[in-house]
Amino acid sequence: MSHLPPAIFLMGPTASGKTDLALELARVLPCELISVDSALVYRGMDIGTAKPAKALLAEFPHRLIDIRDPAESYSAAEFRDDALAAMAEISARGRIPLLVGGTMLYYKALLEGLADMPSADPALRAELEARGAAEGWAALHRELATVDPESAARIHPNDPQRLVRALEVYRVSGLSMTAHRLRQVAQNPLSDRSAGEHLPYTVVHLAIAPTQRQILHERIARRFRLMLEQGFVDEVELLWRRGDLHASLPSMRAVGYRQVWEYLDGLLTREQMVERGIIATRQLAKRQFTWLRNWTDLHWLDSLGDDNLQRTLKYLETAAILA
């Protein structure tokens, strides 16, 4: 058995049932929850992020939820620092960190560390975002392919946040993200390892999703419409009326929030907002699946399984996570 303390990653696409399973595990295991979700960090963004209810958060506290105002940014590097601190504190008390969420870049940052990259340039970022809105993101993707084909191959044309960051790195430094990573590997060969040497834990990797993609699509559509019934538009309108927020902020680029914001701006009808919100959520799920397909040592669970808790506990025992 490894001498490293244990940790559990519970991953999966949006609307797959990650949170429900995590809460079941928290009821029976000596574990504490850490959110791995780039939207749940924001206060006042509850309905559209499917944030656990306040009563559940009181019973089962989640680290890294409600830690930023929507006007602020939150990077993968900040997440890594915060998550490592939370994991160390949980482990020091003899308990198991259970990380749950679908922001796959955050998991990757934890496992592999992050290459040193230039700081953000707000003016340049605003320029690139304006170009993407005017010319279409496919145009920026083609531009990225000319200066950093490796990153372009990894980044989907419908992923504006990563597109903008990759182009920003090149414009600021004159080096592509790929070149930065290669330079870091040359300086420290261990930085290219992907088996978790940067994370001093014995990690069990779990993923949950329906076995049929159509079932996930139906769950996504049903959940988005339920969010609207629960007051999602009113939630976004409170943010929209603040006056200090805008559509280009990372918080307002979150799936669903962008579409409702455009509806409030009069750019979409309600019907268009609903349709585009559902499509954007499906595209997010597709990107999450792409990450997960390339993940190693991943134990899959079926969202519709009626014995996921027992199956997970049995797997954790087999993996020697449970004493």
Swiss-Prot record:
Family: Belongs to the IPP transferase family.
Catalytic activity from the UniProt record: adenosine(37) in tRNA + dimethylallyl diphosphate = N(6)-dimethylallyladenosine(37) in tRNA + diphosphate
Assembly behavior: Monomer.
Coiled-coil features, chain-numbered ranges: none
InterPro entries: Dimethylallyltransferase (IPR039657), IPT (IPR018022), P-loop_NTPase (IPR027417)
NCBIfam families referenced in this protein's UniProt entry, alphabetically: miaA
Organism, as annotated: Azotobacter vinelandii (strain DJ / ATCC BAA-1303)
Known function: Catalyzes the transfer of a dimethylallyl group onto the adenine at position 37 in tRNAs that read codons beginning with uridine, leading to the formation of N6-(dimethylallyl)adenosine (i(6)A).
Site (Interaction with substrate tRNA): 103, 125
GO molecular function: ATP binding; tRNA dimethylallyltransferase activity
Protein name per Swiss-Prot or TrEMBL: tRNA dimethylallyltransferase
Biological processes annotated in GO: tRNA modification
Annotated positions binding ATP: 12-19
Enzyme Commission code(s) on record: 2.5.1.75
Cofactor entry: Mg(2+)
Region entry Interaction with substrate tRNA, spans: 37-40, 161-165
Lineage: superkingdom: Bacteria
Binding-site positions, substrate: 14-19
Alphabetic keyword roster: ATP-binding, Magnesium, Nucleotide-binding, Transferase, tRNA processing
Region forming the signal peptide: none
Lineage start: Bacteria, Pseudomonadati, Pseudomonadota, Gammaproteobacteria, Pseudomonadales
